[in-house]
């Protein structure tokens, strides 16, 4: 699976690692992704999401129902 947050859309990005002598070598910066289950009261079930820590904090702030409609739109 891709290392992408399902709420914020954060994904790995490339950059430079710098040594003490300021030599640049390419490297990847990966987001802090966690698998987390949330209880969705309207559906009466758990939903498992892969989120960055920022995404978990946003769900704690606004609630899972707010993001649930964006992640799983009605068909």
Swiss-Prot record:
Key words of the record: Ribonucleoprotein, Ribosomal protein
GO biological process: translation
Molecular-function GO terms, alphabetical: structural constituent of ribosome
GO CC terms: ribonucleoprotein complex; ribosome
Location of region: Disordered: 1-21
SUPFAM superfamilies noted in UniProt: L28p-like
PANTHER family in UniProt: 50S RIBOSOMAL PROTEIN L28, LARGE RIBOSOMAL SUBUNIT PROTEIN BL28A
Assigned protein family: Belongs to the bacterial ribosomal protein bL28 family.
HAMAP family attached to this UniProt entry: Ribosomal_bL28
NCBIfam families: L28
Protein name per Swiss-Prot or TrEMBL: Large ribosomal subunit protein bL28
């Amino acid at each position: 699976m891709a290392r992408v947050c399902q709420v914020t859309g954060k994904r790995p990005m490339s950059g430079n690692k710098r040594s003490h002598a300021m030599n640049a070598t390419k490297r990847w910066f990966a987001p802090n992704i966690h698998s987390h289950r949330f209880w969705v009261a309207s559906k009466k079930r758990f939903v498992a999401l892969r989120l960055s820590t920022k995404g978990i904090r946003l769900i704690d702030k606004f609630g899972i129902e707010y993001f649930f409609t964006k992640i799983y739109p009605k068909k």
